[in-house]
Amino acid sequence: MKNRKKLLFILFPLLILLILLGRILCHPSFSTYTSRLFRQELAQDTITLHYTLSDPEAYGFKNMSASLGDFTYASFQKRIQDLKDQQVSLQNFLDQDLSEQDAMTAELLDWWLTGQIEMEDFYYFQEPLGPTLGVQAQLPVLLAEFAFQKEADVDLYLDLLKQLPDYFAQIIDFEREKASHGMFLNGESLDQILAQCNAMLTVDEHHFLITS
């Protein structure tokens, strides 16, 4: 299960580590930039934030509303524009005489931002569902292992549960749109996902969501 959580954040580990380093690097304005980008990325959804930081308030996350994320085209477009804005800001630092460590961080961020922005024309190539790493497989595990360190975490968890119907409704709408473009899941993957969902619905006293 620990490996599953690592796979969920496959795009973020190295990026986040380097951004964290940016908070103590010698160029103060670049440190401010990386800290802002760090917060922007973690603010995408509450579960990512909760699993990454044990004390979010120490990084400027205060009074945030619980969110599983937004799986709509409007949200996708906004994120692409935000990333473009971040890359424009980053160009100012790439042209400066940064320290070796700052320069390496800036180059990595530029590479990552470019890759994310290039997805702009490939919205329907996204696939939130999958037999192993799909949302329907990952989310129950993440919720089962959600850490409760303080009372506020309980409220946060309950707020996340309330959002599940709307979140999955967005994913269903997205899959319908993909199907209309002839890009729906292949039959084998679909059968595995449906079998997995049906198994989740077979609840007894040994179900991992209960025993955990």
Describe the residue ranges of each PLM region:
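N-terminal maturation segment of proteins
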Residues: 7-212
